[in-house]
Swiss-Prot record:
Record keywords, A-Z: Ribonucleoprotein, Ribosomal protein, RNA-binding, rRNA-binding
Official protein name in the record: Small ribosomal subunit protein uS19
PANTHER family reported for this sequence: RIBOSOMAL PROTEIN S19P FAMILY MEMBER, SMALL RIBOSOMAL SUBUNIT PROTEIN US19M
A Gene Ontology cellular-component term: cytoplasm
Role played: Protein S19 forms a complex with S13 that binds strongly to the 16S ribosomal RNA.
InterPro entries xref list: Ribosomal_uS19, Ribosomal_uS19_bac-type, Ribosomal_uS19_CS, Ribosomal_uS19_SF
Gene Ontology biological-process entries: ribosomal small subunit assembly; translation
Source organism per UniProt: Campylobacter jejuni subsp. jejuni serotype O:2 (strain ATCC 700819 / NCTC 11168)
HAMAP family: Ribosomal_uS19
GO molecular function, one term: rRNA binding
SUPFAM superfamilies: Ribosomal protein S19 (SSF54570)
Length: 93
C-alpha cells in the first residue's frame, strides 16, 4: 500500500539537513548515509549519496529518474554467485 499523499514522502531529518547544506554551499562531495529508507525528492537531483549496504558504501548519483524511489533500492545488499548445481551439471555433460 502506498503512503498517503497528505503525509508526503518520508525523508530522515538528518539527510534533509545535509542536502540543504550541500545545495547551499554548492558542495559536490558525496553525502554519506545509512538511511536506506529515505525517499528521493527533487531537492536531491545532482547530488551523490554514499548509501550503506551493510558492508560498504555504494555511490549513488541522483537524476530525475530516481525521484520517488528509496535510496536503498540502488545499493544492493546481497550478491548472487549462482546456484551450486547448475555449474556441476555443465561440467558433467
Amino acid at each position: 500500500m502506498a503512503r498517503s499523499l497528505k503525509k508526503g514522502p518520508f525523508v530522515d531529518d538528518h539527510v534533509m539537513k545535509k542536502v540543504i547544506a550541500a545545495k547551499k554551499a554548492n558542495d559536490n562531495k558525496p553525502i554519506k548515509t545509512w538511511s536506506r529508507r529515505s525517499t528521493i525528492t527533487p531537492d536531491m537531483i545532482g547530488l551523490t549519496f554514499n548509501v550503506h549496504n551493510g558492508k560498504s558504501f555504494i555511490p549513488v548519483y541522483i537524476t530525475e529518474n530516481h525521484i520517488g524511489y528509496k535510496l536503498g533500492e540502488f545499493a544492493p545488499t546481497r550478491t548472487f554467485k549462482g546456484h551450486k548445481g547448475s555449474v556441476q551439471k555443465k561440467i558433467g555433460k
